A protein has these predicted regions:
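Short, solvent-exposed loop/turn segments at secondary-structure junctions
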Residues: 12-14, 36-38, 50, 102, ...
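Active-site/ligand-binding neighborhood in enzyme catalytic cores
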Residues: 93, 102-204
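Short amphipathic alpha-helical segments and helix-helix/interface helices
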Residues: 19, 70, 202-203
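Dinucleotide-binding Rossmann-like beta1-alpha1 core, especially the glycine-rich loop
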Residues: 49-126
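Glycine-rich FAD pyrophosphate-binding loop
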Residues: 23-48
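Gly/Ser/Thr-rich beta-alpha loop segments that engage phosphate groups in nucleotides
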Residues: 12-17, 41-42, 199
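N-terminal Rossmann-like FAD-binding beta1-loop-alpha1 element of flavoenzymes
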Residues: 4-31
């Protein structure tokens, strides 16, 4: 195979993996990035004062169902098991997220079975919204005003810097509601974080 000079734009996960694969095939690789470091949004570094590992662009938990991907990643870093369990404080009470059966029962002060919880959420939803076009409409249609205002509205404004009425409905489809007691934020089989950080993993 003829060796080629290849320019990779972007030093995040995708860029560095592609670069490594091509380099192992004998190509000459150059990587550029608009930032002055590798790792993309997963870049992390130790705080010099506290020695705490800081995810500079927000927390990242590696999660996948693809065993090939997991095996590839664990060749380059020791992964610490980590399950992301998210809590939210609403009106002085602590709730589990994603919304699950425990969240529903706690919020509405009920002891619903899974089927009863499904029926309750369906009842709370605004059935007059036939084709939701915005995040807000999707939430009101899917989970109703009470859960939307308690768990989604403020968080969404903070995350996106926009009113939910200005965001597309498709965003809410990524936020799960469960009718069991599973409070693991992700459903994937393999979950964890690199022991020495993402930057060290990518450098290897």
């Amino acid at each position: 195979m003829n060796s080629k000079n290849i320019l990779i734009v972007g030093a995040g996960f995708s860029g560095v993996v592609i670069a490594r694969q091509l380099a192992e095939q004998g190509h000459h690789i150059r990587i550029i990035d608009q930032r002055d470091h590798i790792g993309g949004n997963s870049y992390d570094a130790r705080d010099p004062q506290t020695d705490v590992m800081v995810h500079v662009y927000g927390p990242h938990i590696f999660h996948t169902d693809n065993e090939t991907v997991w095996n590839y990643v664990t060749q380059h870093a020791e992964m610490m098991p980590y399950v992301n369990r998210v809590k939210a404080t609403v009106n002085g009470q602590v709730f589990s997220l994603p919304i699950n059966l425990h969240t529903i029962n706690q919020f509405f002060a009920k002891t619903c079975s899974p089927d009863e919880a499904r029926a309750l959420i369906a009842e709370k939803g605004d059935s007059s919204i036939l084709e939701p076009k915005t995040f807000e409409e999707q939430a009101l249609r899917f989970i109703g005003k009470e859960l939307y205002e308690a768990f989604f509205k403020g968080y969404t404004i903070k995350q996106w810097g926009m009113e939910p009425s200005q965001l597309p409905a498709s965003i809410l489809k990524r936020l799960p509601v469960r009718f069991n007691y599973d409070d693991n934020y992700f459903n994937h089989r393999f979950q964890g974080m690199p022991k020495l950080g993402y930057t060290k993993m990518i450098e290897s």
